[in-house]
Amino acid sequence: MAQEDVFKKIVSHCKEYGFVFPSSEIYDGLAAVYDYAQNGVELKNNIKEYWWKSMVLLHENIVGIDSAIFMHPTIWKASGHVDAFNDPLIDNRDSKKRSRADVLIEDQIAKYEEKMQKEVDKARKRFGESFDEQMFRQTNPRVLANQQKRDALHERFAKAMNDMNLDELKQIIIDEEIVCPISGTKNWTDVRQFNLMFATEMGASADNSMKVYLRPETAQGIFVNYLNVQKTGRMKIPFGIAQIGKAFRNEIVARQFIFRMREFEQMEMQFFVKPGTELEWFPRWKEARMAWHQALGFGAENYRFHDHEKLAHYANAATDIEFHMPFGFKEVEGIHSRTNFDLSQHEKFSGKSIKYFDPQTNESYTPYVIETSIGVDRMFLSIMCHAYTEEQLENGETRVVLKLPAALAPTKLAVLPLVRKDGLPEKAREIIDSLKFHFNCSYDEKDTIGKRYRRQDAVGTPYCVTVDYDTLKDNTVTLRFRDTMEQERVSVDQLLGIIEDKVSIASLLKKLQ
């Protein structure tokens, strides 16, 4: 099945089974805005809990904060967002479609990589176990030709972005013969800049109102509070501050479902270190964050680092953790060495000292910062993409199952009475009442037991319990496992011990120790 078709099925599945709804749907929706439904909000909360506990619970020197969305507008002047938070945009005159010039070029680079991979896949199929991929990539003329084109384009693109040379970006689009995905033509306008921040007015009347912004990132709320946290918490460098919160960007080209939205949620941690040690801490956090992702069990081959050649104005090192989505490897987390740019800028614009006094060296300095930043929505999407599975069963039927990590699944256990009579529903409710304080349970009595199993498979419930007539006699139930569909008979008294450890966030956190 084509990857594009797989992605469409995932999007449809999210709506059909209560994970993600188009926002304001009865009013025909609002472009690139989505609501998390009953199962989606549970999965999302579990993702956030996994991240939060991995940061704050497992590290004595990391604490949390929840800063306001509205902040003093000068903060965004200091951070560079007012002057430099822009996207390069280009219009196609025939389709009237507006695109990000950098994304068009990135997609072209990805096409060269796809051509290389197709050659590799064909050769692997032809040669079987004797296939040497490394040797093939080094010697095959078609692979080498596409690699040369990719590398040359990447180098030219990186320089144009670093210089923010808009004319060169357009010339690259022309030279690469990139066409509009709607009209199929190359009738492009010039590239121009567009600021991404949402602005609004704060105040009782237009005469005395203040222009404020919906924050485009959560990091600045940490920076302006870092000294308050350090002093009240008696923190010593190195230490970190974690935050989960909404951010807003006026993306002109929002696309790929919840991957790129105008309202999104971030999980960020800013780690404050002594100047000169930041490049020692950067690789440590780089590896720690990759371990966090891989603890989910999605396979190391589905992740890769993408080190930045073009660095943001505040960074001296940066990398992305990319995950293999149906539409290619895409960023799910960024790790940046932000230097002391942000804190120095806030000192300059506020006129107040926010230097840290180091009692060990008896000196004051502005700390450097290592940042880890995850988009919760992208993380959610990556998990759904990997979990969505279609299986052919022996009877010829197709089973759709979400193979979610048990600790992240919205519901951990479904309790199903075989029939809706003879005391079986009451016994099922009794089991739920004994377990609901430990993990999320659901009750379902409608349709055949087979159909109920399929419904639970589709929402990723790792365990199902069937209550039957034998349950009333010997207090045993049939426990079914989602991924294997295997069943075993266990005592009701054993359920908590069998299930709890496997569905707790602690089961993931222990992999990080």
Regions found by a protein language model. Give the residues of each.
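NTP/phosphate- and nucleic-acid-binding module
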Residues: 1-513
